[in-house]
Amino acid sequence: QGVTYKEYLTTLVVCYEAAVRCGLATQDFYKFLHSTGTYGAFGTAAGMGRLLGFNKEQLNNALSIAEFHAPITPVMRSVHYPSMNKDGVPFGVLVGAEAALETLAGSTGRGYTLELPEYRHLLETLGSTYEIMNLYFKPYTCCRWAHQPITACIDLAKEYGYAPTDVKHVYVHTFDSATQLSKIVPHTADEAQYNIAWPVACSIVHGDVGLPQVL
């Protein structure tokens, strides 16, 4: 469609603002950890809606349709049973795109979680507070929940100069969800990424957890 670089960047911001805000509302409403595939449906619908020039009613339609069809993607199932399902991102994007196309075709949707009164505060900051500014690139190629002990091991090795062979035991103190990450020797890349013992061991031996350590 001849989208300019400025319009592309603006649309990217729209995607993140919609995804994060809808994600916060959805997470609170259902009281269990959803994954990024769920929120990606909102972000994709909002982004495509902007590129297609949707008005307010059309955008609300697309977001409602996206919510009704978004993947459930329970986070802890990915943690307990690592596989290529991971966070359901591909189908979240597909649902968001289909929601925009359905809106163009005349399908309607009414209401979505972010519109509920208890989440009004998430809408009131639109245009003044940007959630995209709270994002970053993950430094290690594994679940974010394992990053704190990885960083701690790397920093300690730099500070005290010990060799991997000097380490006999490692005790990790972390939050409950992170303790449910796998602690076995992985046989697949997915098992290596949804793990806590393996990445920590890699950080001690290699000083990093990148692509070579999880393949």
Question: What is the predicted role of each segment?
Answer:
Residues 81-94, 101-215:
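Terminal-appendage/accessory-domain detector
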